[in-house]
């Protein structure tokens, strides 16, 4: 419990930019990974901390009477969690889970500090070579907007499916 709390607090309480620098440069003597691998690791670990907190709050949002009722019907704690609590918790948490996914798309731009070639990095290179900063970064904004819009549409479809008892 203490280790998990420390993990969540550390990664939620420090900027991803600093985490990326620490993982890539600070741990380089111990791990020989490239920038992309370090970037994927830091986004995954950072997201894991936020997702743990989202799921925890989702579980706590389920009325205590639900688990008491399941236990009184003879279900085990594992069955209660699997069949009663988690389905409701995921349904309650899905908007926050979707928001975290959208944030990940946008936060990937921070990985350019460790040399990951991504959209922002490419845009900066193009803008520097063409001296057309306004147009280049406007296009970059539109690409990010398209990516997040597509993700939002897909997440809304999934959320409707989750909330519709006929489609489940």
What spans do the regions from the language model cover?
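Transmembrane alpha-helices and adjacent helix-loop boundaries
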Residues: 1-168
């Amino acid at each position: 419990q203490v280790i998990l709390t420390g993990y969540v607090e550390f990664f939620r309480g420090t900027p991803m930019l600093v985490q990326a620098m620490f993982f890539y440069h600070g741990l380089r003597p111990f791990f020989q990974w490239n920038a992309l691998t370090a970037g994927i690791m830091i986004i995954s670990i950072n997201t894991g901390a936020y997702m743990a907190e989202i799921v925890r709050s989702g579980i706590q949002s389920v009325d205590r009477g639900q688990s008491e009722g399941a236990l009184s019907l003879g279900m085990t704690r594992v069955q209660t969690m699997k069949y009663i609590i988690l389905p409701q918790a995921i349904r309650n948490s899905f908007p926050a889970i979707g928001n975290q996914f959208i944030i990940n798309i946008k936060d990937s731009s921070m990985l350019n500090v460790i040399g990951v070639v991504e959209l922002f990095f490419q845009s900066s290179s193009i803008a520097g070579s063409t001296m057309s900063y306004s147009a280049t970064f406007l296009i970059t904004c539109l690409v990010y907007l398209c990516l997040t819009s597509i993700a939002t549409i897909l997440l809304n479809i999934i959320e409707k499916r989750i909330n519709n008892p006929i489609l489940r």
